[in-house]
Amino acid sequence: MIVDLEASSAEDAVALKEKITDKLHNFIVAENYEAIFSISIGVIDAATFCEGTEECRKKFEFALKQAKSMGKNGFYVFDQDDYEVFLQKGRIVAALRNAVVNHYDGFEVYYQPIVDCQTEQIIGAEALMRFSMITEEGREFVSPMEFIPLLEETGLIIPAGRYILNEAAAMCCEMQKYIPDFRMNVNVSYVQILQGNVERDILDAIQKYALKPECLCVEMTESGFMDMTPSFCKFRKSLEKNGISFVIDDFGTGYSNLHCIRDMNPSYVKMDRDFTAKAMNSDRDYELYKNIIPMVHSINVRICAEGIEEKEWLLKMKEMKVDYLQGYYFGRPCGKKQFLQQYASGINVK
């Protein structure tokens, strides 16, 4: 329902909402109905934000949608900045859909080296999804923080994830010409597990490129499987059965704990980059970081420290006997061609 109200402020709209609520309540009581209801209200100053009926309708629908997203009896006053964010999300989703149906044009895989902490030699890489969309100014890179949640919301992460997985497997095969035991880490989303058949996708990629199963490592953040235990356990058992490595990403954030490591039995855990940075700049965090390492090692799980940016940090990680390292000190994520040029030799990365 749309109400055209002459009002001097949003408070007038709130007052109207209360009147409507009271009227409905009194009617229900008087007629002896049994009903539970709530009223969500979106408010827009049409004189300020609308130039025509169609624009007003679209912006009002947005305001009402925002109000409903706040829960029962939600109330939202139109904000132009929020609306611009909403429109940008719509543009990104449209671009993602278009890319998927056009042979993944706009998607690209970047690779960041993972090195052995003691020898400083490259032993693998993490495959990272990147996306750019066409705008009036040309190609515009979209932050993974923006487009990956949208891929998950729309289900497009299933075909896009399959594409990235195959590209990463092909790159692993290429790198093994130079580094025989090279391993590739690929991120998997909870949506791929719940709605797709990612186990089959992984096995198909391994078979297609004749990879040893242990050379393909599946990464997931703990938040990705906290709320889907049955589905995740089935997925985890499938990985174990087929000899595919499993890695817990971003350890040290959110719900991450040692019980998780014990129950999930990963090949190794990746210490979150922010956790690493704090440990390098705070004695208290350093002691915590240092004491976690032997506990994790005691249950036969290795550790990769993310976010290594300085030589001093590298030396501290050596002292703490961390197994693997990843970070800008060894190399920023880059495309396939650049990665091959820089790291195919297999020598020390620095």
Label every PLM stretch briefly.
Residues M1-G90:
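Cyclic-dinucleotide signaling modules
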Residues T21, H25, C172-Q176, I206-Q207, ...:
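Surface-exposed amphipathic alpha-helices with a cationic face
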Residues A35-S40, F107, A125, F182-M184, ...:
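PAS and PAS-like sensory/regulatory domains
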